[in-house]
Amino acid sequence: MKSSATVVLLVAAVTAAMVMSSSASGDAVMIDEHNNIMTSVEGKRGIGSSVVANGGNRKMANVLLSGWENKCAGHGESCLGIGISGCCKGYYCSWPSGSICLCVPKGDPCGAMHTCCDGLSCTGFFSGDCV
């Protein structure tokens, strides 16, 4: 009984920390309806929700990740929290140096993880230059 309460508190603490860090950037909404805590991040990121439900003597915690909105982060937009695959085609996430989506301009080195800007191509798969 103590361990399930500890798990619920741990999940609630992690969720609260995620919501606070997300709220600081102004892109999240937290809704508390009768102790059911839901977090929603709109726009270019997915929607996550955490629900703490009271089921008799036990509390059950479910962390759900809803479907992605099929949107991506474009040039100069933050990719923090959405990972390298969250940038639009033709862009890569500069994580951890700046955590924004970028593309490689003409004449600069490129490769599989550093894609050229629209209209340009890389002379090599792993290593080359944008032309």
Swiss-Prot record:
Record-level GO cellular component terms: extracellular region
Proregion positions: 25-69
UniProt KW Signal keyword: yes
Signal peptide: 1-24
Source organism: Dendrocnide moroides
Claim: Cytoplasm is one of the keywords in the record: no
Keywords: Disulfide bond, Ion channel impairing toxin, Knottin, Neurotoxin, Plant defense, Secreted, Signal, Toxin, Voltage-gated sodium channel impairing toxin
Tissue localization of expression: Expressed in trichomes, that are stiff epidermal hairs located on the surface of petioles and leaves.
Function: Plant defense neurotoxin that causes pain and systemic symptoms in mammals via modulation of voltage-gated sodium channels (Nav). Potent modulator of human Nav1.5/SCN5A (EC(50)=55 nM), Nav1.6/SCN8A (EC(50)=0.86 nM), and Nav1.7/SCN9A (EC(50)=208 nM), where it shifts the activation threshold to more negative potentials and delays fast inactivation. Also shifts the voltage-dependence of steady-state fast inactivation of Nav1.6/SCN8A, but not that of Nav1.5/SCN5A or Nav1.7/SCN9A. On Nav1.7/SCN9A, principally acts by binding to extracellular loops of domain IV (Nav site 3).
GO molecular function: sodium channel regulator activity; toxin activity
GO BP term, example: defense response
Name of the protein in question: Beta/delta-urticatoxin-Dm2a
Top-level taxon of origin: Eukaryota
UniProt similarity note: Belongs to the urticatoxin-2 family.
Domain notes: The presence of 'disulfide through disulfide knots' structurally defines this protein as a knottin. This toxin contains 2 'disulfide through disulfide knots'.
Disulfide bridges in this chain: C72-C88, C79-C93, C87-C101, C103-C117, C110-C122, C116-C130
Places the protein is found: Secreted
